[in-house]
């Protein structure tokens, strides 16, 4: 398939994802399985966040949990930063972990989400960071450790403090790699 016809198909899928007709949306979601376009990640997350249809949510979650396209990490991180996705941020973090993405350059962002987010979001961030196999830049780890220490000391009674302490321990153990 030529690049222009592939782009046209992706644009058609995007249009159908937001058609408002559940049957058309489901067909568009199913078409996404045959595409390896990173430009579909954010629209799929938007559909996931906005649909009331459990079947559509399940299909989208399955796609995003198993996504293997170049630059998916950037699309997920952009979606995490989008305030419109606040109610599904835990799910986006889960998609990152399930898809095997190694966000080594974004450890600080994940640490800040763990601190500022819900308990469930903090747990997802811990899981992602614990399972990173790739080398993480030392300065990112040191910055995350500093931010976590500050958060833990300033919020000792926060229900997430134990979880944040676990994250701190994971990050500190990674400093031994240097």
How should each PLM-predicted stretch be described?
Residues 1-4, 23-35, 46, 57-69, ...:
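Structural detector for internal amphipathic alpha-helices that build alpha-solenoid repeat scaffolds
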Residues 9, 24-25, 40, 56:
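Short N-terminal amphipathic alpha-helix/helix-capping patch enriched in small hydrophobics
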Residues 20-21, 52-53, 84-85, 117-118, ...:
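Short inter-helical turns and helix N-cap capping residues of alpha-solenoid HEAT/ARM repeat scaffolds
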Residues 50, 116, 131-134, 150, ...:
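General structural signal for alpha-helix termini and helix-helix connectors
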Residues 113, 118, 125:
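Acidic/histidine-rich alpha-helical segments that form the ligand environment
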Residues 142-151, 159-165:
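Preference for long, well-ordered alpha-helical segments
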């Amino acid at each position: 398939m030529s690049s222009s016809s592939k782009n046209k198909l992706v644009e058609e899928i995007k249009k159908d994802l937001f058609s408002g007709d559940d049957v058309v949306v489901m067909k568009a979601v199913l078409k996404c399985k045959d595409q390896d376009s990173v430009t579909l990640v954010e629209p799929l997350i938007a559909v996931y966040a906005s649909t009331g249809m459990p079947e559509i949510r399940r299909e989208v979650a399955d796609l995003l949990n198993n996504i293997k396209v170049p630059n998916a990490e950037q699309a997920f991180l952009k979606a995490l930063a989008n305030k419109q996705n606040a109610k599904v941020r835990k799910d986006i973090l889960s998609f990152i972990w399930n898809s095997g993405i190694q966000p080594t350059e974004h450890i600080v962002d994940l640490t800040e989400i763990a601190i500022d987010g819900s308990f469930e979001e903090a747990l997802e961030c811990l899981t992602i960071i614990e399972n990173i196999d790739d080398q993480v830049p030392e300065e990112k780890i040191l910055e995350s450790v500093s931010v976590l220490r500050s958060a833990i000391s300033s919020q000792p009674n926060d229900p997430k403090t134990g979880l944040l302490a676990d994250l701190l321990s994971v990050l500190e153990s990674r400093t031994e790699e240097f």
